[in-house]
Amino acid sequence: MKSIRNSAKAVIIRDDRLLLTKNKDDESFFYLFPGGGQEKEEELKDAAVRECMEEIGQEVEVGELLFVREYIGKNHQFAEWDSDVHQVEFYFRCSLKHPDAAMGNGIHPDEHQVGVEWVPFDRLREIRVYPSALGEKIRSGVFGPCYVGDVG
């Protein structure tokens, strides 16, 4: 089994919209929170800043920790190829340092990433957003409890 991986994610909200990366697979489009793996000797907040530059091309200011989510691959719909993955994800409230700057893919977008999109809260139920449980919490304005466990 692989070792447990830490990941820092950004929750960026503006005018009842959530900034997400737009991705495409064989099925359709899906949306993810910007962020990714923590590197050795890197603080989680620094990982969130670096990952946002890579994925959304924007500098962010990292605020409070909102959620801690575990992803245990064997328990989710992608178990066929993710069964040995165990990741602990830390979701931070972030804000854009330059909110009026042009938005688009960053300097190193993820493999399936095709763009960046401000998604209105009322659309979060209509799209594939991962993890969907956190999309629902944010849509409802619920920012607790911090530890949410292995939710999809």
Predicted features and spans:
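Conserved N-terminal beta-strand and adjoining loop/helix that marks the start
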Residues: 1-19, 66, 91-93
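A generic structural micro-feature
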Residues: 2, 80-88, 108-113
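Conserved Nudix-box catalytic region and its N-terminal flanking loop in Nudix hydrolases
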Residues: 17-58
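A short coil-to-beta-strand element that immediately follows conserved catalytic motifs
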Residues: 59-68
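Active-site-adjacent beta-strand/loop module that shapes the phosphate/pyrophosphate-binding cleft
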Residues: 73-103, 137
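NUDIX/MutT-family hydrolases
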Residues: 105-138
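Charged phosphate-binding loop/patch that engages nucleotide di/tri-phosphates or the phosphate backbone
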Residues: 130-152
